[in-house]
Design a protein with these regions (language model features):
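Phosphate-group recognition and catalysis centered on beta-loop-alpha active-site segments
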Residues: 2-5, 9-22, 26-286
Length: 286
């Protein structure tokens, strides 16, 4: 496929952007959103599966969104499995172009008046090295949009890209002196030589590390392990996220989220945007 230029993509996107940026009166984004702080610890797992990718998460004030990508030719297509890919659903069309337009409209930030970057977690589903190198070429077209790391020094931008998924992406990333993306580490990376300037986030599968799923009492040994993990990461300037936590609304999910909150986890992983928003608001967590 021919690679669509940023200018062409933005021109095509502009026809619909105005409607997206000005949702109907009464929506959270149009009315209440501007008066309520973003929920920086809220992470939209598989965000692209919502009716309005990116914008549904922003409507619920989320601070992090996740997009799975496949390298097909020179295009980065967004989807969970290869058989559901649509050539029209690219990383540019669903995320990069809308974010660029939002940041321009909001004078340098995704959420107007809040300078903290939005996290874009990009989960690579195809071979990591080649996909990352193509992704890097795409990211270069968006000057001044992203947090960068130049020679070990981090320069904040409106959007921070964090690369997850296939671990082979690490090799070309480590070879770069200037990056527009950061690495999503695993618990096995804690305490290694990877600094927070390379791996600011540590994510792992909850159910491969803990047995408790929110019912009954949280075993004390597991609670101490959780707090130890978070403390170790925070001491190195890294943030922590767990995926595969219970996500069915009910007491078990609330109990587990409460333990994560008490332990100081940095991102709550969910498909239920409204449910997590309500939980964090009830606990007055930004």
């Amino acid at each position: 496929m021919a690679l669509v230029t940023r200018r062409t993509a933005l021109t095509a996107f502009g026809a619909t952007l105005a409607a997206v940026l000005a949702p109907p009166a009464g929506s959270a984004f149009a009315d209440d959103h501007k008066h309520r702080a973003p929920l920086w610890r809220a992470h939209a797992h598989n965000d692209y599966e919502h009716p309005r990718p990116l914008f549904d998460a922003l409507d619920h004030r989320f601070g992090s969104v996740e997009a799975d990508i496949f390298l097909v030719g020179d295009q980065l297509l967004v989807g969970h499995t290869a058989d559901e890919l649509d050539p029209k659903r690219t990383l540019e069309s669903l995320y990069l172009d809308p974010l660029a337009a939002l940041v321009k409209a909001n004078h340098g930030s995704v959420y107007r008046g809040y300078r903290r970057p939005l996290q874009l977690l990009i989960d690579i589903k195809t071979e990591g090295s080649s996909t990352y190198l193509e992704l890097d070429r795409h990211l270069r077209r968006y000057q001044h949009l992203f947090t960068t790391c130049a020679h070990g020094r981090v320069h904040p931008g409106a959007v921070t890209n964090v690369i997850s998924g296939d671990r082979a992406a690490r090799i070309p990333m480590e070879a770069q002196s200037v990056r527009r993306a950061f690495y999503d580490g695993r618990l096995t990376d804690l305490g290694t030589s990877a600094p927070a300037s390379f791996a600011p986030l540590v994510s792992d599968n909850w159910q491969l590390n803990f047995t408790w799923l929110g019912e009954g009492t949280f075993p004390d040994a597991e609670r101490q392990r959780l707090r130890g993990i978070i403390g170790q990461a925070h001491a190195r300037g890294q943030k922590v996220r767990f995926w595969n936590t219970p996500d069915l609304a009910g007491p078990a999910r609330d109990a587990l989220w409460a333990e994560l909150l008490d332990a100081g986890v940095d991102y709550f992983n969910t498909d239920d945007l409204a449910g997590l928003e309500a939980f964090l608001d009830a606990h007055r967590v930004a």
